Amino acid sequence: LFHSEKLNDGNAAELLKDMDGILIAPGFGQRGIEGKFAALKYARENDVPCLGICLGMQCMVIEFARNVMGLAEANSTEMEPNTPYKVIDLMEEQKNVTNMGGSMRLGAYDCILKKGSKAYEAYGQTHIQERHRHRFEFNSEYRDKFEAAGMMCVGENPESNLVEVVE
């Protein structure tokens, strides 16, 4: 078990070489973010199974955009509001919210999984519900570019069309 603040591109291979899988945990803000990116890059380049939850999934998207798609300045608007590549962005309905108390997307939400995906394999069904607690989402304006580069959007909310799962 490694705290992401202790990981970087220089030590990730040595520290993670014996891992059978990597979990990138949820969180908020900048703390440990570069270590999460280092772990994700190592996992992707070495075919180590990886699960990113909430901010962890967002970091997967950012790392992929930077290192596979060549969008070196890709980021979340939570970390860098002026990033030229807003691959993770504040939900549209959140952009004018000034009172943050109780403003997050909370509770269980429907998600439809694509058959043949690893997520479908794990759940054994197409319709699932998962709980949420966040305000930032995968920016669907980039969906086609991500899928063309090999990151597939395999879980989607049927009402909002928000991407919930990527592989």
Go through each PLM region and give its residues.
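Short, flexible loop/turn elements at secondary-structure junctions
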Residues: 3-5, 28, 115, 142
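C-terminal and late-domain segments of enzyme folds
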Residues: 15, 106-167
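A short linear-motif detector with a strong N-terminal bias
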Residues: 2, 88-92, 132, 145-147
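Cysteine-nucleophile active-site neighborhood
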Residues: 15, 21-110, 116-118
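A short, well-structured beta->alpha microelement
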Residues: 1-13
